[in-house]
Swiss-Prot record:
Similarity comment: family membership: Belongs to the ClpS family.
Stretches the record annotates as Disordered: 1-33
Subunit organization: Binds to the N-terminal domain of the chaperone ClpA.
Organism, as annotated: Verminephrobacter eiseniae (strain EF01-2)
Superkingdom to which the source organism belongs: Bacteria
Pfam families: ClpS
The protein, known as: ATP-dependent Clp protease adapter protein ClpS
Biological function: Involved in the modulation of the specificity of the ClpAP-mediated ATP-dependent protein degradation.
Gene Ontology biological process terms in this record: protein catabolic process; proteolysis
InterPro entries: ClpS, ClpS_core, Ribosomal_bL12_C/ClpS-like
Signal sequence bounds: none
Amino acid sequence: MNFMATRAPTLPPATRPAPDDGGAVVLERRPEKTPPPQMYQVVMLNDDYTPMEFVIVVLQEFFSKDRETATRIMLKIHLDGKGICGVYSHDVAATKVDQVLDAALKAGHPLQCVSEPVA
């Protein structure tokens, strides 16, 4: 089969930019800044059964606290009913809570730990 064009293809006419009349609007692109991620604090709750030494070991092992800092946080938990172990992104905070709860369960202690958004 032979296909024949009925007319030759035409190019669109060349356009020239219009002279600037001073009324042109120039839009500037601003770089978008993503907000920082929501941070969460890991809070350990006091109970009357978990030994203080176990709380200190957990703070050292899972939150990389030195003995003095871990003892200070443990005393805050004991005296105030709760204490902040650290501030992390959502995923890291959730992982740390799970680690603490697993360690407490394996050791037979009722220690509770939660994460809450930082205000």
